[in-house]
UniProtKB/Swiss-Prot annotation:
Record's GO cellular component terms: cytosol
Family statement drawn from the similarity comment of this UniProt entry: Belongs to the DNA mismatch repair MutS family.
SMART domains: MUTSac, MUTSd
GO BP terms, alphabetized: mismatch repair
Keyword DNA repair belongs to the record: yes
Pfam families, sorted: MutS_I, MutS_II, MutS_III, MutS_IV, MutS_V
GO MF entries: ATP binding; ATP-dependent DNA damage sensor activity; damaged DNA binding; mismatched DNA binding
Reported function: This protein is involved in the repair of mismatches in DNA. It is possible that it carries out the mismatch recognition step. This protein has a weak ATPase activity.
Binding site for ATP: G615, P616, N617, M618, G619, G620, K621, S622
Keyword terms, alphabetized: ATP-binding, DNA damage, DNA repair, DNA-binding, Nucleotide-binding
Official protein name in the record: DNA mismatch repair protein MutS
């Protein structure tokens, strides 16, 4: 927004412009009565983003001032829309008293809502993490920090390549990303909402260390194991400063920072996460993903933890076996069936505690926290049956916290209002002084009944009543027929059709006392509300530990239920290289198919590291490859897998080159996308990687594609020695196992019945003998006349004769293409000619002979 002189504006608009100048890059919601108003460019932008009316208010330099507004009671819905579009909003409230203000009511920005720092329940995706991140770049190296403000989970890492950095961005999917003004690889930031440019100095190392030490109350960062991660700390320092600035309060729930070591995880690049459809399908939705099948958790915080596990598979066998042991006990004992319903009543304690830490928790947050704590005794009874060490550790952290539960039971009403603003939150009996003022504020009904009875008897007026309304306050009402009996000290206040209303000094005095008591009771209640936070915050760490334990117990119990319901087996994790699966199934496809899923084995080891997979389209090659990767992934998450048995060696990375589409925005063709992903695999795969390669080379000419596919397969097999599944339609590649050790052919079979085809979906040893392309084309609805013509062409090709209408030349061709084309007779004859040995006449004769060979 351009700078605007405030001299020619009203005092209110001058105040607005001053506040806007302090928040120039974000929308300012300026409270005016029952509305939040936006002006100038903010109003234009908000009207577009929120689809609200753009109006005008006053003028500036002779031009009307654009204005847009939203009702204050509906603000959460509008904030949610803006946050989803990556926008940030400064909320400016009236903090002064309009009755005592001279000039505009005092206002100030009380909070800044940004996509990565929201904690309000209405603005957050319930079952997905909401992260804010900062990225730092220096001479090809990266520092990366992420924070989940709703849990206090603060992590830092140092990806050493652009490819690794892109994979981290894909894995963490931050809703807000901070970057320096001099950040160079800006292509990493493309196609993202919520990017925030920050000053260079916020990323300085010394500033970062000071910010972090101030946050944690430490002298140095050695105890967190991040002292030497200087690039990561630069990002983390900027991040913590930004969050403090937006929250306008302390952050007591952020007590540590964790170094995310890539060596501890199985690395999945961006293409692999997309192709395996872990938490998002290829269309961008949640349906038919691995998470949809596995996530039957009882709590939202458990659901978020499971997705973190799925996106960051672990290489450490101790951690994995600990999870598998726990799942095994819950499954075999059947305790998962008891735990799930108990956890359903606990709710999202993790995010409630974040709002408690930020002192933004609402009355119903504390009511839900109370309800959660009330479930712990029953859960504790169930967990007494645990025997496995890790389950016992979780049970110890999820024990009842009686003191806090009792405090909340005494303090909060059973069904409190949404906000503290109008009171009515704290329970009767919690505070004696509050109860006294409330009794008075509620009108002291007993006093009024006594006054009514006395006045009625004293003046012999049986229609006399004492009443109250918001306009006239307390009054005495007498019917028209008896109004002549009203004593002289009754002062008429209102005349109705059938009655007169009066006021007397005693009633006026009581009214003043009652009205004063309401404001007094509200002030006391708000003070006690803040004191309640002070009583709860010292227990924050214990409460967070409880929430973390319940989250993990929820995930383990859920995975036990999934293993039991879906007939999964426990994988055996080995240190040796290899994958040996019997009766493997695709976890998603088997659930969405109406027909029984055909289970298949796979065996990869040092003597059999690459499978060349052939077979018809729709035969199941891609499903077979993906299920192998998903089973390996699930084993490294520490959960049971869809197979009869599975032995999984340690993996360092999983790569997939499956399918492709044009990247029009970047000007990259399908083939370019395919080759970029292939290059990434050939550069970064190791002998401990699992590589899935599907139809390499099909986006270019036959010989180019075949050559690239052959060379890629040979490189993976001989130079990298990665465990590889290589699906292809180039049947020449089935010769590779005859040329190199450690390779084998397998195929997915099909059976033809006349013009129909039946896909067997069973993996067989050896190469396929047909591709069944015409049968698949017929299934797809290609016109019969086209299929008929194709069959004729196929017969000509297979017989070695192809008629080319443009010439009379007959092309002879083998049934299978060769990798290196054979030299033609003309080329061979020409190669044998030495021009220096020929006379002019001989040269002319040789030329005629060569022409005759064409």
């Amino acid at each position: 927004m351009a700078t605007k002189s405030t001299e020619k504006h009203t005092p209110m608009m001058q105040q607005y412009l001053r506040l806007k100048s302090e928040n120039p890059d974000i929308l300012l919601f300026y409270r005016m009565g029952d509305f939040y108003e936006l002006f100038y460019d903010d109003a234009k932008r908000a009207s577009q983003l929120l689809e609200i009316s753009l109006t005008k208010r006053g003028s500036s330099a002779g031009e009307p001032i654009p204005m847009a507004g939203i009702p204050y009671h509906a603000v959460e819905g509008y904030l949610a829309k803006l946050v989803q579009q990556g926008e940030s909003v400064a909320i400016c409230e009236q903090i002064g008293d309009p009755a005592t203000s001279k000039g505009p009511v005092e206002r100030k920005v009380v909070r800044i809502v940004t996509p990565g720092t929201v904690t309000d329940e209405a603005l957050l995706p319930e079952r997905f993490d909401n992260l804010i991140a900062a990225i730092y770049h220096h001479k090809g190296q990266f520092g990366y920090a992420t924070l989940d403000i709703t849990s206090g989970r603060f992590k830092v890492s140092e990806p050493n390549t652009e490819e690794a950095m892109l994979a981290e961005l894909q894995r963490t999917a931050p809703t807000e990303l901070l970057f320096s003004e001099d950040f160079e690889p800006v292509h990493l930031l493309e196609k993202r909402n919520g990017n925030r440019r920050r000053p260079v100095w916020e990323f300085e190392l010394d500033t970062a260390k000071q910010q972090l030490n101030n946050q944690f109350g430490t002298r140095d960062l050695v105890g967190f194991g991040v002292e030497r991660a200087e690039f990561g700390l630069c990002a983390a320092g900027c991040l913590i400063q930004y969050v403090k600035d937006t929250q306008r309060t302390t952050l007591p729930h952020i007590r540590s920072i964790i170094m995310d070591h890539q060596d501890d995880s199985v690395i999945l690049d961006a293409a692999t996460r997309r192709n395996l459809e872990i938490t998002q399908n290829l269309a961008g939705g949640f349906n038919h993903t691995l998470a949809e099948i596995l996530d039957h958790t009882s709590t939202a915080m458990g659901s978020r933890l499971l997705k973190r596990w799925l996106h960051q598979p672990v290489r450490t066998h101790d951690v994995l076996n600990q999870r598998l042991d726990a799942i095994g006990e819950l499954k075999e004992s059947g305790l998962f069936a008891d735990i799930a319903p108990q956890l359903k009543n606990i709710g999202d304690v993790e995010r409630i505690l974040a709002r408690l830490a930020l002192r933004s928790a609402r009355p119903r947050d504390l009511a839900r926290l109370r309800n959660a704590l009330q479930q712990l005794p029953e859960l504790s009874q169930t967990t007494q049956e645990f025997q496995q060490n890790h389950l016992l550790t979780l049970a110890a952290s999820a024990q009842p916290i009686d003191s806090i539960c009792e405090l909340l039971e005494r303090a909060i009403k059973e069904n409190p209002p949404v906000v503290i603003r109008d009171g009515g939150v704290l329970a009767d009996g919690y505070n004696e002084e509050l109860d006294q003022w409330r009794d008075l504020a509620n009108g002291a009904t007993q006093y009024l009944e006594k006054l009514e009875q006395e006045e009625r008897e004293r003046h012999d007026i049986d229609t006399l009543k004492v009443g109250y309304n918001n306009v006239h306050g307390f009054y005495i009402q007498i019917s028209k027929g008896q109004s002549h009996k009203a004593p002289a000290h009754y002062v008429r206040r209102q005349t109705l059709k059938n009655a007169e209303r009066y006021i007397i000094p005693e009633l006026k005095e009581h009214e003043d006392k009652v009205l004063n008591s309401k404001s007094k009771a509200l002030a006391i209640e708000k003070r006690l509300w803040e004191e309640l936070f002070d009583q709860l915050l010292p227990h924050l760490e214990q409460l967070q530990s409880m929430a973390n334990a319940i989250s993990e117990l929820d995930v383990l119990s859920n995975l036990a239920e999934r293993a039991d319901t879906l007939n999964y087996c426990r994988p055996v994790l080995t240190k040796e290289t290899g994958i040996n699966i019997e009766g493997g199934r695709h976890p998603v496809v088997e659930q969405v198919m109406s027909d029984p899923f055909i289970a298949n084995p796979i065996k990869l080891n040092p003597d059999r590291k690459m499978l060349i997979i052939t077979g018809p389209n729709m035969g199941g090659k891609s499903t077979y490859m993906r299920q192998t990767a998903l089973i390996a992934l699930m084993a490294h998450v520490g959960c049971y897998v869809p197979a009869d048995s599975a032995e999984i060696g340690t993996l360092d990375r999983i790569f997939t080159r499956i399918g492709a589409s044009d990247d029009l925005a970047s000007g990259r063709s399908t083939f370019m996308v395919e080759m970029t992903e292939t290059a990434n695999i050939l550069h970064n795969a190791t002998k401990h990687s699992l590589v899935l390669m599907d139809e390499i080379g099909r986006g270019t000419s036959t010989y180019d594609g075949l050559s690239l596919a052959w060379a890629s397969a040979e490189w993976l097999a001989t130079k990298i020695n990665a465990m590889t599944l290589f699906a292809t339609h180039y049947f020449e590649l089935t010769e590779l196992p005859n040329l190199f050790t450690g390779l084998a052919n397998v195929h997915l079979d099909a059976v033809e019945h006349g013009d129909e085809i039946a896909f067997m979906h069973a993996v067989q040893e050896g190469a396929a003998n047909k591709s069944y392309g015409l049968a698949v084309a017929s299934l797809a609805g290609v016109p019969k006349s086209v299929i008929k013509k194709a069959k004729q062409k196929l017969q000509h090709l297979e017989s070695g004769q192809v008629s080319v209408p443009a010439t009379s030349t007959t092309v002879k061709e083998e049934h299978q293409l060769s990798l290196i084309p054979e030299i033609s007779e003309v080329e061979e004859a020409l190669a044998n000619v030495n021009p220096d040995d020929l006379t002019p006449r001989q040269a002319l004769e040789e030329l005629y002979r060569l022409k005759a060979l064409l």
